[in-house]
Each structure stands twice: as C-alpha cells, then as structure tokens.
A protein has these predicted regions:
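Amphipathic, heptad-repeat alpha-helical segments
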Residues: 1-31, 70-104, 139-149
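Amphipathic, non-membrane alpha-helical rod segments
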Residues: 14-60, 99-138
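Long amphipathic alpha-helical segments
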Residues: 124-128, 145-150
C-alpha cells in the first residue's frame, strides 16, 4: 500500500507542478503555496511495521496538503476563466439589447486587451467588468435604448 500511495503522490506532485505553473502564468495574484515534496520523506521503510505505519501516516498528510494546494490553485484558475466568461456574457447582453455604444465598445476593447495579458490583471479586470455591467445596465434602461447610442 505504501509503495502505491507514494507513487500516486509522486505523480500527483508532477500534475500539481504543472497546475501551479499554469496559474502563475495566468493569474496576477496566484496563491503562494508550495507543492509538498514527497521525496523528502525518503524511501518506503522495510521491515518494522511501526515505521511503515508512521510513514504511511506522513504520506497521507502529504496527500492532504496536496489536496489543499490543488484546491487553492484550481480556484484561482477558475476565477480567471470566470472573468473571460463574464466578458462573453456582457457582450451577449449588449447584442441582445442591440446596443452599439462607443464608450461600451471602448470598455470591451480594453477588457479584451487585459484578457490577453499574461498574467491577467484579475483585480483590474474585475473592476472593469463591473463598470461594463453597470454601464450596460444604465444604457439598456435609457429611452430608445435599442440601436446606436452616441
């Protein structure tokens, strides 16, 4: 069991390293957690059942730490992807209301440019998308809201 658990954690460690690299490249304020080093525990002890039991307990703690790290980085990546989806939804709402406003188009253009940055400035994008949402809502509520607004 210990050999299999150790091998699984080593494989998971490599996957987490890839996730961390992706998040660091994508998100402007990524979590700051290290991926636990399974190799620091050394090889699986042979012979003594007490040592083996303690080793398995340490492996399980490493697994729990990896789950925490995985959750933190996955949540950060989802947050960045959520911003991209929100921009798509805001554009769709503008299209639905048939709004063609120069200022709204300019806000969308800035959002597009920020989405292309690596890492994405998530706090700035959040504020900008909030501004787009409020402005779009205001435009949609104006008399004669359909069509071009100058």
């Amino acid at each position: 069991y210990a050999q299999r658990l150790r091998a699984d954690l080593l494989a998971r460690s490599q996957q987490l390293d890839e996730l961390v690299a992706q998040v660091v490249a994508t998100v402007s304020s990524p979590p700051k957690y290290a991926v636990p080093d399974v190799t620091a525990l050394g090889p699986v002890p042979a012979g003594n059942p007490g040592e083996l039991e303690a080793y398995i307990a340490r492996l399980e703690k490493v697994g729990q730490a990896m789950e925490f790290v995985s959750r933190a980085y996955s949540d950060a990546l989802r947050g960045s992807q959520k911003l991209a989806n929100e921009l798509i939804m805001l554009r769709s709402e503008a299209d639905q209301h048939q709004l063609t406003d120069q200022q709204l188009s300019a806000l969308f253009a800035v959002a597009d440019q920020l989405m292309q940055r690596s890492p994405r400035p998530t706090e700035t994008l959040t504020a900008l998308l909030d501004a787009c949402r409020y402005y779009l809502s205001w435009l949609a509520g104006q008399p004669g809201a359909r069509g071009t607004v100058d």
